[in-house]
Amino acid sequence: MSWSKVKYFFFDTPEEKEAAQYGYEKEQTDMKKQQDPPEQQDVTFPKAQPKQNVVSIETAKQSSKVVLLEPRTYSEAQGIADHLKGRRAVVINLQRMSTDQAVRIVDFLSGTVYAIGGDIQKIGPKTFMCTPENVDIVGAISELFGEEEETNIKRW
């Protein structure tokens, strides 16, 4: 048995066997269909806009306010804290208060400022500046206060 008969027996299809019996030649067809490349279409994409920083005008106005206060009693501490929660800087003059109440207000405001992520600084005798996180304090004021003032307020 020749190799061509074995190949014919195992690999040819019944249609090919029948065509071989009648003397027809096998058609050579290319399995790959030739396709035209797809037409190029002009597609326009919107240009990427650079990211713009948008700041609300109301926020800019609130951050530029500084509130000056002279509380006389400890009960006014909550109103001062409300200004800080409203993102406004507050300067507090505690000279018209007793020392005990002034210390209590500073303690209360220190906790408030810590809770909102702000800052509190002494800017003069019995005068403090409290700021929320959106206000930066730059610089420092040296303490050149009189000795008698220092002895009256032991805690500051």
From Swiss-Prot:
Kindly list the places in or outside the cell where this protein is found, as annotated in its UniProt entry. Answer: Cytoplasm
Its chief place of residence is cytoplasm
Instruction: List the InterPro entries hit by this protein, alphabetically.
Output: Cell_div_SepF, Cell_div_SepF/SepF-rel, SepF-like_sf
Q: Where is this region: Disordered?
A: 20-50
Q: Where is the composition biased (Basic and acidic residues)?
A: 20-36
One Gene Ontology CC term in the entry: cytoplasm
Coiled coil spans: none
Q: Which GO terms describe its biological process?
A: division septum assembly; FtsZ-dependent cytokinesis
Q: Could you tell me which Pfam families the record lists for this protein?
A: SepF
What keywords were assigned to this record?
A: Cell cycle, Cell division, Cytoplasm, Septation
Superkingdom of the organism of origin: Bacteria
Share what the entry says about its subunit structure, partners included: Homodimer. Interacts with FtsZ.
Role according to the record: Cell division protein that is part of the divisome complex and is recruited early to the Z-ring. Probably stimulates Z-ring formation, perhaps through the cross-linking of FtsZ protofilaments. Its function overlaps with FtsA.
Annotated family: Belongs to the SepF family.
Its name, as the record gives it, is: Cell division protein SepF
Origin organism is: Bacillus cereus (strain ATCC 14579 / DSM 31 / CCUG 7414 / JCM 2152 / NBRC 15305 / NCIMB 9373 / NCTC 2599 / NRRL B-3711)
Recorded name of the encoding gene? sepF
